[in-house]
Amino acid sequence: CALAADYAARGHEVTLIKTSHSLHDDNFSHLCATGGRMRIHEFGTDTACVIAHLSRDVADVRGKDIVLLCTQTGYHPDVLRRVVPFLTPGQILLMIPGYLSTAYALGLHLADGVILAEAESNFIDGRIGAPGEFQVGFRNVRNPIGVYPHNALPAAREVLDRLGTPFVYLKSVAEAALHNPNMIVHTVGAVMSIPRIEATHGDFCMYHEAFTPSTWNLLEVLDGEKMRVLEHLGCDPVP
């Protein structure tokens, strides 16, 4: 919802498609009731946004220049099975974050000429404070993405740069997937916090509690292993 509202505020015609009735369904219902109106609160600045179109029909991805897939990565296979049949040559499917879900899309008989792109991480971090109200935590000033096939990069770049997001284009979607920091941060933080999570019955905030010096040491070692994998793949091991 936040990305849809943000791009709408930048002047893009946006269609927000909700593919389930689970997370943030109350916010989507609010948007439907108010004509797509949402406010973004960002460090003392309030921006009123109007999302042009709201839908629960995945067929509405047809004809869109860019299709952004923003659902949780665990649901990528299911959502892609529903979306891919409606994609046509020239469209760009941008998965945020990607986590190498390009592999799922390619296994679904994707139409020739559809361009796939994977973002390393979300462009905007924040929380929905109330229906129709989004509080920005931070914006990434550098947003790495990979494009598949690689020879489609010039055409994809021409379209994606119109969004106004500060993109950095990587060598491959694999590089974008491996560079996602959550692969390391969430794994170490969650595993090392299991006793604390159980003791508090889930009343726990990983970013505030998990990363003691010993846990951070483990994170650094595992991240170093990942960097060596990136080097062997011919990618840039950006820390």
Predicted regions and their residues:
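C-terminal substrate-binding/catalytic lobe of Rossmann-fold NAD(P)-dependent dehydrogenases
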Residues: A177-P239
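Rossmann-like NAD(P)(H) cofactor-binding subdomain of soluble oxidoreductases
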Residues: L68-L69, T73-F134
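Short beta-strand and adjoining strand-loop segment in the mid-core
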Residues: P131-N151
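Hydrophobic anchor at the start of a short beta-strand
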Residues: V14-I17, V114, F167
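Short, conserved charged micro-motifs
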Residues: H150-E158
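NAD(P)+-binding Rossmann beta1-loop-alpha1 motif at the extreme N-terminus of oxidoreductases
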Residues: C1-I40
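Short, well-ordered alpha-helix to beta-strand connector turns
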Residues: G11, I51-A52, K64-D65, G90
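Short acidic low-complexity segments
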Residues: H41-G63
